[in-house]
Amino acid sequence: LLLLGVPGTGKTWVSEHLAAAISGDSTLLVQSTAGTTEEVIRYGWNYASLIARGPTAEALVPSPIMTAMRDGKVARVEELTRIPSDVQDALITILSEKLLPVPELGEAVQAVKGFNVIATANDRDRGINDLSSALKRRFNTVVLPLPATAEEEVTIVSRRVADLSRALELPAELPAADEIRRVVTIFRELRAGLTEDGRAKVKSPSGTLSTGEAISVVNSGLALAAHFGDGRLAPSDLAAGLTGAIIKDPVQDA
């Protein structure tokens, strides 16, 4: 399964909860970066043991994906498109044949029933690599869009802000719906490049201004209100967070 969408649409949250619900374990994770190598996806070696005894089963260091194959669990690959394209293709045999060859030992790991992979990928971000057609065909792709309506987005932001405030034990009053609606409206207008009433065009910034960023802005404002204010969220508490979310590139977004 490939969860595709812009940053901040809840792909990681969905993948984590799906893995936990299906196999009772969401920790078999490959966190992708531009420096991710095939060893991270397939397997590596304990080099001290490898030098002393050569390639043995004891010297082999399984990747999270190999562990998931052996245990019949779900492996997660975060930010798949950040992995270089030639390394991504190491997944093709694993996904199509459910098989991971280990030629150094003259054997292969056959996936146990229950094994699967849930990957997430951004389709609008810097530093991403296109997926090959062969790899795309081996995934069932689900696109996670931004909320369709302002009301839906306000509801999502309100719920997540309340959850995070409880988790962080912030001694601040939860923001009124009007404050959250103001942040959501700003984000939606900038994403669309048009004011809510359709009368004026506005410049869209280079960032995605996702729902996740709206949650972060409101939560950051609550923390400022709790520790440096009177415990009530004020527009001034949101201002710094809004500036940081909107102006990602000082030149392009000026």
Model-derived regions, located:
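Conserved AAA+ ATPase small/helical "lid" subdomain
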Residues: 154, 161-232
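Residues that form generic nucleotide/phosphate-binding pockets
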Residues: 44, 138, 156, 160, ...
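A diffuse structural propensity rather than consistent per-protein peaks
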Residues: 37, 61, 210, 232-239
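AAA+ P-loop NTPase catalytic core and its hallmark functional loops
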Residues: 1-168
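Short acidic/histidine-centered micro-motifs embedded in hydrophobic/aromatic stretches
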Residues: 9, 94, 186, 238-241
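C-terminal engagement/docking regions of AAA+ P-loop ATPases
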Residues: 226-254
